[in-house]
Amino acid sequence: MKEEIAATVVFLTMLVKKHKQLSKQKIEKFAAKLTTILFAKYKNHWYAENPMKGQAFRCIRINTYQAIDAVFEKACAESNVDFNDLGLPKEMTIWVDPFEVCCRYGEKNDPFTIASFKGKDGYNAPKRISHAVEKATSDYYSGTSSDEELTNKEPKTIPKVSNPNSIYQCADYSQAIPSWSQYPRRKNYQNNGYPPNPPMPYYPQQKAYKAFRQSSAFSGPRVDRYHWVNMKRSAIS
């Protein structure tokens, strides 16, 4: 843990020196306070047999949309240093794990190794840290900030054409395209915003059937409801 924390502090200190805003005494005091704070934070969350365990807890992160990491906030307060004077990037992530310290600039770049203590790699730690600082501050690894992606790009306009035979000289193309605000807006409907139901189709009223009329051939008095008497036939007989 001692080597990994030392590599982290040296890496951050070299970045602060490149910014040239703090004196040598303030940088050394900040580095000493940061080392003490990291030791106190990692002592119960360091698992050499499983380096991935506790990685999120040991991660040091700087992001535009997040508050200052508690590690930097405490180190700056105890060393009487303004965080903005450190000159650290707007977005940076450092993973302090057993046997390896990695860093990533921006949100889309690939992480790179600051120092590795696996086997013989530990002997080249100072040289590797210096190389990591140069690599991190280069133009390629400066990273794209997440807030830069939110900026609106101005729309490109068609350049003016001096050729009189160009199609862009026609009246149809030279006129500006009307904005959408000139068109009438969609009507607002009542009833919770839904359009009214369409009218029901009109069906003509059907002609009623006529009631059944008894034929004149069966006219006459009725004996009962099943028999009728024909008066003409009874008179002949």
Swiss-Prot record:
One Pfam entry name: BTG
Say which family it is in: Belongs to the BTG family.
Highest taxon in the source lineage: Eukaryota
Q: Which species is the source of this protein?
A: Xenopus laevis
Full protein name: Maternal B9.10 protein
For this record, the Gene Ontology CC terms, alphabetical, are:
cytoplasm; nucleus
Q: Which InterPro entries does the protein's record reference?
A: Anti_prolifrtn, BTG, BTG-like_sf
